[in-house]
Amino acid sequence: MKLDKYAVGQRYAKALFSLAEQEQQFESIHDEIQALETIFNDNPKLGTVLTDTTLSGLKQRNLLESLSNDFSTLMQHFLSLVFDYQRMAEMPYIIAAYEDLYDQHKGIAHAKVTSAVALDDDQLAKISQSFAKREGLNEVLIESVVDPDIIGGIVLESNHKVIDGSVKHGLDQIKSLLLK
């Protein structure tokens, strides 16, 4: 059975995460994962190039080595394993899955806060602290979005949860009740 890219990402990320913890390189591997993410974002076709059968294996290996020269031995071995199993095209999925595991371990969540007007840093910090406390998290990293259509209030989205405290949502609920 062929695994989808998401499942591949999960498996490889779990293995790397576990090994990083075991080798007490948790933070340094996370830093290297972030560096890899930047490399793959800057070069979106890199994974495809490293799995392309029309290129010689030696050229691909040399490219991989030049890419990973500044990384730890653990990360170099991991990248070599991913390369040997021809999974470099799935590297963005591996990176995303590793970031998710890291965030879970550290008690970090990402949230999108939508408001009718731009919120200042103090307001965003209060929302972040309040949501972190409510959810038992250490930190909530907020992306702020302005959408005048919500009229007022905020809509917070995080980890498949939506807390809709917008005026538009309240008006829609009242309208729904009146039309019954």
Curated annotation (Swiss-Prot):
Q: How does it sit in the membrane?
A: Peripheral membrane protein
Where in or outside the cell is it found?
Cell membrane
All disulfide bonds of the chain are none
Q: What coarse category fits the chief subcellular location reported for this protein?
A: membrane
**Record flagged with keyword Transport:** yes
An annotated GO cellular component of this protein is: plasma membrane
Spell out the Pfam families in the cross-references.
OSCP (PF00213)
* A molecular function GO annotation: proton-transporting ATP synthase activity, rotational mechanism
The entry sums up its family as follows: Belongs to the ATPase delta chain family.
What interactions and quaternary structure are annotated?
F-type ATPases have 2 components, F(1) - the catalytic core - and F(0) - the membrane proton channel. F(1) has five subunits: alpha(3), beta(3), gamma(1), delta(1), epsilon(1). F(0) has three main subunits: a(1), b(2) and c(10-14). The alpha and beta chains form an alternating ring which encloses part of the gamma chain. F(1) is attached to F(0) by a central stalk formed by the gamma and epsilon chains, while a peripheral stalk is formed by the delta and b chains.
- Quote the NCBIfam families the UniProt record gives: ATP_synt_delta (TIGR01145)
What's the protein name? ATP synthase subunit delta
User: What is the protein's species of origin?
Assistant: Latilactobacillus sakei subsp. sakei (strain 23K) (Lactobacillus sakei subsp. sakei)
